Amino acid sequence: MKITKFLGLSFLLFAFAATSFPDGVHAEDPAAVLDFYGREVQAGASYLIDQEDFRVVNATINPICNSDVILSTGIEGLPVTFSPVINSTDGVIREGTLITVSFDASTCGMAGVTPMWKIGFNSTAKGYIVTTGGVDRLNLFKITKFESDSSFYQLSYCPNSEPFCECPCVPVGANSDKYLAPNVSYADFRFKPDARIEST
């Protein structure tokens, strides 16, 4: 009899908690990142990253071979792919979640060369910039809505993915030499499906 009463009381407490704290029990996924056409950005698909002024994200060297990430004008950009750290059931990239970013391009075959983005020091660019050669799950970024325009997004680097660093994510923009770099002027980005993929 006591066991029956205990089980009944436990059920009532659980039901009360579920109705009193619905957000904790029925947590919703963050909003999906949308591409240029208003469609959900998909993990593993190829996208070109551009700005409202039509500058596009590109690499200093292609094929990727210790290449740096830049904003360029007047030429076709180099597509990237996004991969979530925690795989979602629907394969959608969502706002504010940790991701890796990689150029969708071949590499030169040197040891340790990868198309994945990371932050590295560059004496030519006079500081830390976004470059290639990243390692999965150690070099993380996130995408959030750009403050001034809901149709554009902000890309941020999250140094808390680095060992022994509990630091906030920092926005990525373009420095005076057009290198993508952390903690410089804000940059508003949008994501266009790679036309070469769309046409296949």
Swiss-Prot record:
Entry-linked Pfam families: Kunitz_legume
Gene Ontology terms, MF aspect: endopeptidase inhibitor activity
Tagged with keyword Signal: yes
Keyword Nucleotide-binding: no
CDD domains listed in its UniProt record: beta-trefoil_STI_GWIN3 (cd23380)
Cysteine pairs bridged by disulfides in the record: none
Induction field: By wounding.
Keywords: Signal
Residues annotated as signal peptide: 1-24
Family affiliation: Belongs to the protease inhibitor I3 (leguminous Kunitz-type inhibitor) family.
Protein name: Wound-responsive protein GWIN3
Top-level taxonomy: Eukaryota, Viridiplantae, Streptophyta, Embryophyta, Tracheophyta
